[in-house]
Amino acid sequence: MSLNKVRASEYRRIFVNDHPIMDARAPVEFEKGAFPASVNHPLMEDEERKKVGTCYKERGQEAALKLGHSLVHGEIKQQRVDAWLDFFSKNPDGYLYCFRGGLRSQLTQQWLKEAGLDIPFIEGGYKAMRQFLIETIDDAPNMKPMLILSGITGSGKTDFLLKRKEAVDLEGLAHHRGSSFGRYHEPQPSQINFENALAVALLKHQDSAAKHLLLEDESYLIGRSALPQAFYTGMQAAGVLVLEESLDARLARLLNEYVHKMHSGYIQRLGEEAGFEAFAQYLAQSITGIKKRLGNKQHDEFQAIITNALNIQTSQNDTSAHLEWIELLLVKYYDPMYQYQIDKKADRVIFKGDHQAMHQWLDNH
C-alpha cells in the first residue's frame, strides 16, 4: 500500500507559506520545540508515550504497538480523532507529522482515513524538518550579503528595521531587546523555538526581492536566546551601518519603551495595583542586572532616583522624572559601552546617518 506523504523537497514551501501542520507528538516533545505554524494534537499523551517507549526497548515493536492500541482505544481514541478532524476541517490543506515520520504518522493517518479523511504526513517528521532549518541558518550568511545596523542605545534601530523589507527582526523573534532593560512582557521562546522561527524568517527573506539581509547589531545572546554560531560569525564579518540620533530623541524614545510601554503592558496583564508593582520590580531588577558594572555606590544612586520617579509618577501622574535616570544610564553606562564596541568595528563601517539618510542609502544600494 502506497502511503500519502509529503516529500522532503517540499519543506521550504511548507515553511515559507506557513502551511498548517498538525504535530502528532506528545505534549512534552512539542513543548521542547515546535514549528511556528504547527498545532499539537497528540496521538499519545506523555505518560502513554513513556510506557510505549519502555515497552519498545524491552519487548520490541510488535509488543509496543499492541500496548499503544490498548492505551488509546474506545472513547479516548475517539476524542483524539475528533480533535484531528476538527483541525483538518479548519485546515483542509494541512499536513501531519510525528518525530521521524514513522509509525505515529502512519497510525494517525490510518485513523483519519477510517474517519473519512486522507491526510498526507510529512516525510522525515520533526527531526528531518528541524535539521533542514538548522542548515538554513548555517547557510544564511552565504545566501545574501549581510548588513548590520548599529547605533547608540535609543537611536531607534528596531523602529527603523521594521520599516525595511531587507530586515529580519532578531529581537522580535527573541522577545527581548538585547539589553538589561530589554525584557518583553511575553516570555522568551525556548532556544529551539527561537532557532526555528529565525530559520523560517530567513527562508521567507531568501524568497523575497531584498538584495541584502539587514540585521540589528546584537551580541551572541539576546536575553537568553543564543544566536547560532555560524550565523553569528557571519554577522561579525558583515558591513556596518551606523544609525545616528539626537540625545533628546533618544531620551523620548527610551522613556516610551522603558516606562510608558512597560507600565501599560503590566497593567493590561495584571491590573492597576499589581501591574504597577510588577513595573517597579522590572525597573529595579534591570538596574540590579548591571550592578557589577555600575558599582555599589552608583547602583544605589540609580535605585534612589528610580524610586523617586515612581513616587512622582504615582502621586502626580507624571512620568517625566524618569528622564533623570534614563539620561544617567546613557551617559554612565550605555554610551561608553557602545563607543567601545563601535571602535572595534570601525574598519567595517560603510555608512553613517540619521533615519532619513539611512533609508535613502539603503534605497540606493
UniProtKB/Swiss-Prot annotation:
Molecular-function annotations in GO: transferase activity, transferring alkyl or aryl (other than methyl) groups; tRNA 2-selenouridine synthase activity
Keywords on record: Selenium, Transferase
EC number: 2.9.1.3
Stretches assigned to the Rhodanese domain: 15-138
Catalytic reaction equation(s): 5-methylaminomethyl-2-thiouridine(34) in tRNA + selenophosphate + (2E)-geranyl diphosphate + H2O + H(+) = 5-methylaminomethyl-2-selenouridine(34) in tRNA + (2E)-thiogeraniol + phosphate + diphosphate; 5-methylaminomethyl-2-thiouridine(34) in tRNA + (2E)-geranyl diphosphate = 5-methylaminomethyl-S-(2E)-geranyl-thiouridine(34) in tRNA + diphosphate; 5-methylaminomethyl-S-(2E)-geranyl-thiouridine(34) in tRNA + selenophosphate + H(+) = 5-methylaminomethyl-2-(Se-phospho)selenouridine(34) in tRNA + (2E)-thiogeraniol; 5-methylaminomethyl-2-(Se-phospho)selenouridine(34) in tRNA + H2O = 5-methylaminomethyl-2-selenouridine(34) in tRNA + phosphate
Chaperone among keywords: no
InterPro entries per UniProt: Rhodanese-like_dom, Rhodanese-like_dom_sf, SelU
Gene3D superfamilies listed in its UniProt record: Rhodanese-like domain
Claim: Lipid biosynthesis is one of the keywords in the record: no
GO biological process: one example: tRNA wobble uridine modification
Active site: C98 (s-selanylcysteine intermediate)
Subunit structure: Monomer.
HAMAP family: tRNA_sel_U_synth (MF_01622)
Role, per record: Involved in the post-transcriptional modification of the uridine at the wobble position (U34) of tRNA(Lys), tRNA(Glu) and tRNA(Gln). Catalyzes the conversion of 2-thiouridine (S2U-RNA) to 2-selenouridine (Se2U-RNA). Acts in a two-step process involving geranylation of 2-thiouridine (S2U) to S-geranyl-2-thiouridine (geS2U) and subsequent selenation of the latter derivative to 2-selenouridine (Se2U) in the tRNA chain.
Family, as annotated: Belongs to the SelU family.
Name of the molecule in the record: tRNA 2-selenouridine synthase
